Amino acid sequence: MPRQLSFGLDTRVSALVVRLACVALAGALVACSSAAVPAPSVRFTPIPTAVPTATTTTAPSDSPTPSATPAPNYTELPAAANDAAALATQLSMVEAALRDPKVTDPELGWLGHLQQLDYGRLQDFPEWKETVLGALPEKTRAAVNGSLEAGKQLRLLSGPVPKSLPDWKIVAAAPIDELLGFYKEAEAEFGIPWYYLASIHLVETRMGRIRGLSSAGAQGPMQFMPATWASYGTGDINNDHDSILAAARYLKAAGAPDNMQKALFAYNHSQAYVNALVLYAEVMKNDPAGYRGYHGWQVYYPTQDGSVLLPVGWIKE
């Protein structure tokens, strides 16, 4: 979340980022809430059946049941494999398909979601990592490892499990080519490499899927505080194009691209946050097709009963 540069340092970490951080690698039962904004103590209103409901997933057991790796069924929610060998086969298929230009939506989005869950499984069972990564091509192995390390950095922001679901509305992400066009337009105008903007977009709102319903805090796909938006934004704070250009404008004012570390730290005053952004950016810099996977990552949220998937159309009532 970018801060108003002229107001001096503000060491708070984005409430949204902290909550997303804990489910950066979905699949584990994780514990977190905002360090800056305590989780509300009131219970959330039950979700009407007329809108998509949150899907609960529990943490895997210490000894999951081995599973075969069936052919993808794109009509069902993806599920990560339950043993190292099957996960290696599954992730090899996922990573190859994500890099195949002939694969498009809706299959592409489904595969990105499965990639997210597979990475979560590796986070849950780190002893599988050598087996799984060993089955991947070297370039792909580096991309997967970079994503796993980024997830570890974001989990450093974790805290207690929230007591209620967030004041969010979940919307569909804009198409890949459209968002890539926005990042590259911002890069051409402000000199900020596109993959840093994509990393912020991923970490802050899962490529614009999260719409905060509170007018008091950070808003929009790139999570601007209203005062900061007044200085660096133009147009609609909830518009991907306008928000991405504003983020590039802010980073430029904060020292980018000459000093990306400094500029990213100005965006959100957490070194773990900066480390994660750099790691995701390096994945996309070295392998631009990596964005195709990240674009499919979904919104998960931690609860007392496990992580829940907040699907497109979900809104807190």
Where are these regions (language model features)?
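Cell-wall glycan-active module
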Residues: 1-185, 271, 279-317
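Surface-exposed, polar/charged faces of alpha-helical domains
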Residues: 103-106, 216, 262
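Surface-exposed patches in mature extracellular/periplasmic domains of secreted proteins
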Residues: 127-131, 191-199, 212, 256-267, ...
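Alpha-helical segment that forms one wall of the substrate-binding/catalytic cleft
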Residues: 174-189, 195, 208, 221, ...
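Solvent-exposed coil/turn segments that connect beta secondary-structure elements
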Residues: 203-206
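Glycine- and aromatic-rich loop/turn segments at beta-sheet edges
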Residues: 211-217
